[in-house]
């Protein structure tokens, strides 16, 4: 508890595979940390060990907590991450395209959600550059389902 955060925080979130890789490794089966005391030094309550690992859809350690939708999808597992399509191995349809759901999406420190489907591009996937409000050079780098870079802002039609 002393290495986690304030006393109101339970240590179950404070894993090396959760949120920050430098967090303490001792854990228990108690409920997860509350955001009121753990948002800065512990894993956020949405983090789950099966999702918030350094292999979760990224080849490097995550710098932000996984969202519930990320933790609930099979594509968040290491068996799927990095593939151009998920298929049956991830329990997703062939339209799953984590090829553009990577750390380079919009902001380098953003944890992009895996298993992005065509219907969800620009909403809960990591493709905010497909929104007219995000017309910045650093934002528009990858078109939907294509690993090629673009130099101009993405249009809604790219999704």
Swiss-Prot record:
What the entry lists under InterPro entries is as follows: KAP
Stretches for region 15 X 5 AA repeats of C-C-[RQVSGE]-[SPSNQ]-[TASPI]:
8-157
Where is it found, in Gene Ontology cellular component terms? cytosol; keratin filament
Q: Describe where the sequence repeats fall, as residue ranges on this chain.
A: 8-12, 13-17, 32-36, 37-41, 46-50, 51-55, 56-60, 65-69, 70-74, 75-79, 80-84, 129-133, 134-138, 139-142, 153-157
Keywords attached to this entry: Keratin, Repeat
Q: Name one Pfam family in it.
A: Keratin_B2_2
* Known partners and oligomeric status: Interacts with hair keratins.
What family does the Swiss-Prot or TrEMBL record give for this protein?
Answer: Belongs to the KRTAP type 9 family.
- Sum up the protein's function in the record's words: In the hair cortex, hair keratin intermediate filaments are embedded in an interfilamentous matrix, consisting of hair keratin-associated proteins (KRTAP), which are essential for the formation of a rigid and resistant hair shaft through their extensive disulfide bond cross-linking with abundant cysteine residues of hair keratins. The matrix proteins include the high-sulfur and high-glycine-tyrosine keratins.
Report what the protein is called: Keratin-associated protein 9-8
Q: Gene of origin?
A: KRTAP9-8
């Amino acid at each position: 508890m002393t290495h986690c955060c304030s006393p109101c925080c339970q240590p179950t979130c404070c894993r090396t595979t959760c949120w920050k890789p430098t967090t303490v490794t001792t854990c228990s089966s108690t409920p997860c940390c509350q955001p009121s005391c753990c948002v800065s030094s512990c894993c956020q309550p949405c983090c789950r060990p099966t999702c918030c690992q350094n292999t979760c859809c990224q080849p490097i350690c995550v710098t932000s907590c996984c969202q519930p939708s990320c933790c609930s999808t099979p594509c968040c597992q290491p068996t799927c991450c990095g593939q151009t399509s998920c298929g049956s191995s991830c329990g997703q349809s062939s339209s799953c395209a984590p090829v553009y759901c990577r750390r380079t999406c919009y902001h380098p420190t953003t944890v992009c959600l895996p298993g992005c489907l065509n219907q969800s591009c620009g909403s809960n996937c990591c493709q905010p550059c497909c929104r007219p409000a995000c017309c910045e050079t650093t934002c528009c780098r990858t078109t939907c389902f294509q690993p090629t870079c673009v130099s101009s802002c993405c249009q809604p039609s790219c999704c």
